[in-house]
UniProtKB/Swiss-Prot annotation:
Compositionally biased residues, Low complexity: 34-51
Full protein name: MAPK-interacting and spindle-stabilizing protein-like
Residues modified to N-acetylserine: S2
Biased composition (Pro residues): 74-127, 164-190, 198-207
Region feature (Disordered): 1-245
Keywords: Acetylation, Phosphoprotein
Residue ranges with Polar residues bias: 17-26
Keyword Lipoprotein: no
Entry annotated with the keyword Acetylation: yes
Family statement drawn from the similarity comment of this UniProt entry: Belongs to the MISS family.
Chain positions with Phosphoserine modification: S2, S6, S15
Length: 245
C-alpha cells in the first residue's frame, strides 16, 4: 500500500470526477475537473480569475466609461485640463485698430466772439494800507524796506494812518478846575474843629395837614353770592350728619 493519499481514493466509485480523472489523466497534468490552482487549497498561489477588464474589451466599448483610477475614484479630477496651457493674454489685438485718422468735422464750432463785455459790477478793490494813494500810478518810489519811502513825501501822499476826522485838542495849559462844592453847603472845616452855629436842620418839620381817619367798622359791600338766612347755627355741611325733627 502506498503512503501517499490521493483525492481519487476519497471519492465514490461512480463519481464522474473520479472517472474522468482516472481515464483522462496524463502524466504531468492535473485532473480536468479541478482547476490547476485553488486559492483555498494554496493561499499563496495567485488567483486564476483575471482582474480588471477582459482583454477583448476596450474603454470605448464599456457601457459606463473607462474604469476610474486613483485613490478616490468617485471624486472628479481637479486641476487644469490635460494638454498645453492656453496663451494668456490671447495673441492678437482685442479690438480692431482704427481705420485711420478721423475726418474733420463738417460744421465748424463757434469761434471766439471777441473781447468780453464790461462786467455790470466793478471788481472789489484789494485792501491796502492806511493812507496809501488810491491810484497806483501816484505811489512814490519804494525803499529797501517796502512800504517806507526812501525819499521825501510828495504832495498829496498820505501818511501811514489816515487824517482824523476831528482835530486833536491843543496841548496848551488849562486852568485849574475849581474844587467840587455843592451849592449852599458850608465851607470845608479842618479836622478836629467844630463849626460855629446850631446843629440840625434849619427848621422843624411841618405838622401834618390833617388827621388820619379813626379806624372803625366799615359797611360790608353787597355780595351777590350771599347765603339765604336760615335757622340759627351753622348750616349743615354737605355729606355730614343731618338732624331729624
Amino acid at each position: 500500500m502506498s503512503d501517499e493519499f490521493s483525492l481519487a481514493d476519497a471519492l465514490p466509485e461512480h463519481s464522474p470526477a473520479k472517472t474522468s480523472a482516472v481515464s483522462n489523466t496524463k502524466p504531468g497534468q492535473p485532473p480536468q475537473g479541478w482547476p490547476g490552482s485553488n486559492p483555498w487549497n494554496n493561499p499563496s498561489a495567485p488567483s486564476s480569475v483575471p482582474s480588471g477588464l477582459p482583454p477583448s474589451a476596450t474603454p470605448s466599448t464599456v457601457p459606463f466609461g473607462p474604469a476610474p483610477t486613483g485613490m478616490y475614484p468617485s471624486v472628479p479630477p481637479t486641476g487644469p485640463p490635460p494638454g498645453p496651457p492656453a496663451p494668456f493674454p490671447p495673441s492678437g489685438p482685442s479690438c480692431p485698430p482704427p481705420g485711420g485718422p478721423y475726418p474733420a468735422p463738417t460744421v465748424p464750432g463757434p469761434g471766439p466772439t471777441g473781447p468780453y463785455p464790461t462786467p455790470n459790477m466793478p471788481f472789489p478793490e484789494l485792501p491796502r494800507p492806511y493812507g496809501a494813494p488810491t491810484d497806483p500810478a501816484a505811489a512814490g518810489p519804494l525803499g529797501p524796506w517796502g512800504s517806507m519811502s526812501s525819499g521825501p513825501w510828495a504832495p498829496g501822499m498820505g501818511g501811514q494812518y489816515p487824517t482824523p476826522n476831528m482835530p486833536y485838542p491843543s496841548p496848551g495849559p488849562y486852568p485849574a478846575p475849581p474844587p467840587p462844592q455843592a451849592p449852599g453847603a458850608a465851607p470845608p472845616v479842618p479836622w478836629g474843629t467844630v463849626p460855629p452855629g446850631a446843629w440840625g436842620p434849619p427848621a422843624p418839620y411841618p405838622a401834618p395837614t390833617g388827621s388820619y381817619p379813626t379806624p372803625g367798622l366799615y359797611p360790608t359791600p353787597s355780595n351777590p353770592f350771599q347765603v339765604p338766612s336760615g335757622p340759627s347755627g351753622a348750616p349743615p355741611m354737605p355729606g355730614g350728619p343731618h338732624s331729624y325733627h
